[in-house]
Regions:
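Short, low-complexity Ser/Thr-rich regulatory SLiMs
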Residues: 77-79, 182-183
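Short histidine-centered catalytic/ligand-binding loop motif
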Residues: 86-94
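Interaction-mediating elements
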Residues: 101, 180-183
């Protein structure tokens, strides 16, 4: 599997890792906790081809750096992909992110492996359509960009969940790079960070 990510800056990364450690210490059988802090733009079963790197390089170098803002916590209850409740930090609505996702996915979908667009877990027609077309269920306006903390089962009434939802947060994150990762189970291996075009307005 290949993941295309936005990585958090230092301040945001510290906050995400603080919560990851807190949840990991408190609960067993958590999911996604060991994953490096990131926001997923695209995640799909792509053929392991060096051409992907060249395509990404060409695509990303045309994208100008930009800012994202994170002002609230979010929980995806009964997450179809994890079977638990997934704790996240929501990224404020940003049309630039949707444009970037569209650009990247359009270029990479030709590298999708055969039969990588099937899913037995999804029932939502919007997610199924996206999965069939792109090999990832969250491409388009229904995508909710976020940074994940972790996913936990049957703990939504815990003090930790309550504290997380009550957190007052305010982060601004400069996005100067987009990174590509190889993912095997819970193991994430950085392939390359691609620098975005300098934006004089940033």
């Amino acid at each position: 599997m290949i993941g295309i990510f936005i990585e958090p800056n230092k301040e945001l990364k510290i906050f995400i890792n603080k919560w990851k450690k807190k949840i990991d210490k408190k609960f067993i059988n958590t999911k996604l906790i060991s994953h490096p802090p990131h926001s997923t733009i695209y995640y799909a079963n792509l053929i392991n081809d060096k051409d992907i790197i060249q395509v990404l390089k060409k695509t990303i170098k045309t994208i100008k750096s930009f800012k994202i803002y994170i002002n609230k916590t979010l929980i995806f209850y009964d997450d179809k992909l994890t079977g638990g409740d997934t704790m996240c930090l929501a990224i404020n609505k940003n049309d630039k992110l949707f444009q970037i996702q569209k650009q990247i996915v359009k270029k990479l979908k030709i590298f999708l492996k055969k039969d990588s667009t099937k899913s037995n877990k999804l029932t939502n027609s919007l997610l199924l359509t996206s999965m069939k077309k792109y090999g990832y269920p969250f491409v388009g306006k229904h995508w909710l960009p976020h940074f994940t903390i972790g996913s936990i089962k049957n703990k939504r009434n815990s003090i930790e969940f309550k504290k997380f939802m009550e957190e007052k947060i305010k982060f601004m994150n400069n996005v100067n790079y987009i990174s590509a990762w190889k993912i095997v189970g819970n193991k994430h291996i950085l392939i390359k960070r691609f620098k975005l075009k300098v934006n004089e307005k940033n």
